[in-house]
């Protein structure tokens, strides 16, 4: 337990980089508009400054200083546009979503994954054998995303990819590490910290995991914080050789520019140092379906004392080829992480975690009010607190079995907590989450 708690407190910063300044009272839309106009002004000034510099003495430090920042901005914009050319591939069809996203239907063999030298010129693998014990009988409704509610779909032979915009990259603290987690995180869990409420299993060999995750729209109070709920499949030590495969939903204003819960994936093979990324923002994950867009908003979402909705995620290792596959919802194979991406996960996982995480930047010196899950404590139960249900793992024989010896941990229980249980219908489950700042969590 102590080793996991220490890991959680020093884990590489999850799903959003934290900045030291906060703009809680400024709307994200206003920030984007003002910043966009500012950049246009900078470009104009740079042209004027460049012309002016030809008639100014080289010894004039004031004139030199005036042209320095515009040149830096121009270089940054050039770098952004070059990165966008790598990420955004030519589309055969484009779909506009009601949430402002643009979904590009990209030929399957031209998606970002195939820029990788070991995949270049290849095509996606055929679907693998499903784990024994898998059944679609409990899938009661068709999971959906906002973009698909338009009635439009991508044609056969293509995959839907959320288009990355210039504004997406301008929100990032580092253009070169856009779409990645930072390599170093402060160990002080009370400042710029990551707080968790998770269930986990360890001590065996794990070849996959499955769960239904309740979907909510928790409040995220700062652009530089996030709230997520996900599955982690982990291998290696919690140092430089950490391997992880991650999938779930997240609200991440910095990464996406809004507060919609979005389906996401992540991977790393070196503890988030130089490998891995979110979604399809680098060469790695290979998408194989035309119905689910990674990074797109999930619909519907749950409401307090109202309708409850969840997404079913299954991650498992193909015993024939060794790739790690991801299934979303009602039997939709999203794609796979190729085996060669990893070191330890080429064999198996050594730990599986399920649960929630938030970033706490301590605005104004107090705990954040960013919510986890539904924003309500676990004790409120169904319809009020968020849940994970039907927790399962995949064993060495490619068989889905119920999770056993599930341990639960909340590292800040006065802010976010967790309560586990079992039932005939839900199997192993837990409720988790909380409001963040409150009288017991100042």
Predicted regions and their residues:
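Classical eukaryotic N-terminal signal peptides for Sec-dependent ER targeting/secretion
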Residues: 1-44, 52-55
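Exposed, interaction-prone regions of secreted/extracellular proteins
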Residues: 31-442
């Amino acid at each position: 337990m102590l080793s996991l708690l220490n890991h959680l407190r020093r884990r590489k910063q999850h799903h959003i980089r934290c900045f030291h300044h906060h703009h809680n009272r400024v709307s994200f839309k206003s920030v984007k508009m003002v910043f966009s106009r500012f950049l246009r002004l900078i470009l104009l000034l740079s042209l004027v400054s460049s012309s002016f510099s030809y008639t100014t003495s080289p010894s004039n430090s004031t004139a030199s200083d005036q042209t320095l920042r515009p040149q830096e901005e121009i270089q940054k914009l050039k770098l952004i546009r070059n990165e966008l050319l790598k990420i955004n591939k030519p589309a055969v069809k484009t779909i506009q979503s009601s949430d402002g996203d643009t979904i590009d239907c990209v030929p399957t063999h031209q998606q970002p994954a195939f820029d990788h030298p070991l995949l270049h010129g290849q095509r996606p693998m055929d679907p693998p054998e499903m784990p024994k014990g898998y059944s679609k009988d409990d899938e009661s409704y068709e999971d959906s995303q906002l973009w698909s509610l338009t009635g439009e779909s991508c044609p056969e032979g293509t995959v839907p990819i959320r288009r990355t915009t210039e504004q997406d990259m301008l929100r990032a603290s580092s253009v070169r590490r856009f779409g990645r987690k930072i390599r170093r995180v402060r160990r002080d869990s009370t400042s710029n910290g990551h707080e968790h409420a998770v269930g986990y299993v360890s001590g065996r060999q794990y070849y996959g995991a499955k769960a239904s995750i309740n979907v909510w729209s928790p409040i995220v109070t700062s652009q530089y914080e996030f709230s997520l709920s996900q599955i982690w499949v982990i291998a290696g030590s919690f140092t430089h050789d950490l391997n992880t495969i991650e999938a779930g939903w997240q609200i991440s204003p910095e990464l996406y520019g809004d507060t919609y819960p979005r389906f996401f994936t992540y991977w790393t093979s070196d503890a988030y140092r130089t490998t891995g990324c979110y979604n399809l923002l680098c060469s790695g994950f290979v998408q194989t379906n035309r119905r689910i867009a990674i990074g797109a908003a999930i619909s519907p979402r749950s409401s307090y004392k109202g309708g409850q909705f969840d997404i079913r995620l299954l991650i498992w290792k193909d015993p024939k080829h060794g790739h790690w596959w991801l299934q979303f919802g009602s039997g939709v194979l999203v794609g796979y992480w190729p085996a060669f991406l990893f070191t330890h996960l080429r064999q198996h996982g050594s730990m599986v975690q399920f649960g929630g995480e938030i970033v706490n930047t301590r605005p104004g010196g107090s705990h954040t009010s960013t919510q986890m899950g539904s924003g309500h404590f676990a004790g409120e139960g169904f319809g009020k607190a968020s849940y994970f249900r039907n927790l399962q793992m995949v064993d060495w024989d490619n068989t889905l079995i119920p999770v056993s010896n599930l341990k639960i941990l909340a590292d800040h229980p006065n802010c976010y907590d967790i309560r586990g249980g079992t039932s005939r219908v839900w199997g192993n489950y837990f409720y988790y989450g909380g409001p963040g700042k409150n009288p017991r969590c100042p």
